């Protein structure tokens, strides 16, 4: 039979062990999200020579599938880094809500879709976000340029070819969403609880 002191010692060890595990998990996530945020912004910079073709939509969806609500951390670390790198000019402001829109849509997708369905749905959603980018960006542009309704529609029409390129690029790069999210989930499960 154990004495009351032995039970208290075991409880203390258990509390300390749980606290260490939580701190370890927090440090792991902090480092991981900083690296993923840096990769998010670096991918945009690296792909600058290709107009409107980048990994931001793909990474937003991958991070959301893998980390759910916590995906906002690396996404907005990356958005902040893009602002620090290129300056916090007016183009940067819509990035703050454009990523949030795609994150929200991804959060609304069922989590337990069959693999074959995911392989179609994820690239299509990513692509639709690219096709709609100009229309989603337009209200902000109209606001800062003082455009009326007609001016905003003309602005959207003028950028339509770039939105088409953006949507096609997002679809092509969106084909990476399923394998990357599976990789992230597998690696996170393997290394996060050590």
Predicted regions: what they are:
Residues 26, 30, 51, 169-172:
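Short, contiguous, pocket-lining structural segments
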Residues 92-94, 115-194:
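Membrane-embedded alpha-helical hairpins and interfacial helices in multi-pass inner-membrane proteins
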Residues 2, 22, 44, 70, ...:
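Context-gated lysine
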Residues 2-37, 74-78, 94-145, 178:
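Short helix-perturbing small/polar motifs within transmembrane alpha-helices
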Residues 37-110:
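Alpha-helical membrane segments and adjacent membrane-interface helices in multi-pass membrane proteins
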């Amino acid at each position: 039979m154990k004495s009351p002191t032995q039970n208290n010692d075991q409880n203390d060890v258990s509390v300390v062990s749980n606290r260490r595990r939580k701190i370890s998990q927090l440090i792991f996530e902090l480092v991981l999200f900083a690296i993923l945020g840096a990769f998010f912004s670096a991918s945009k910079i690296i792909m600058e020579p290709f107009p409107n073709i980048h990994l931001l939509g793909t990474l937003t969806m991958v991070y959301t599938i893998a980390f759910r609500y916590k995906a906002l951390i690396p996404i907005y670390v990356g958005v902040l880094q893009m602002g620090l790198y290129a300056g916090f000019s007016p183009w940067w402001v819509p990035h703050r809500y454009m990523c949030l829109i795609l994150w929200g849509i991804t959060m609304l997708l069922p989590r337990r879709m069959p693999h074959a369905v995911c392989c179609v749905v994820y690239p299509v959603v990513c692509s639709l976000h690219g096709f709609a980018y100009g229309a989603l960006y337009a209200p902000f542009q109209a606001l800062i340029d003082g455009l009326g309704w007609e001016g905003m529609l003309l602005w959207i029409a003028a950028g339509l070819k770039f939105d088409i390129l953006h949507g096609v690029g997002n679809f092509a790069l969106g084909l990476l969403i399923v394998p990357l999210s599976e990789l992230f989930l597998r690696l996170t499960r393997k290394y996060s609880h050590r």
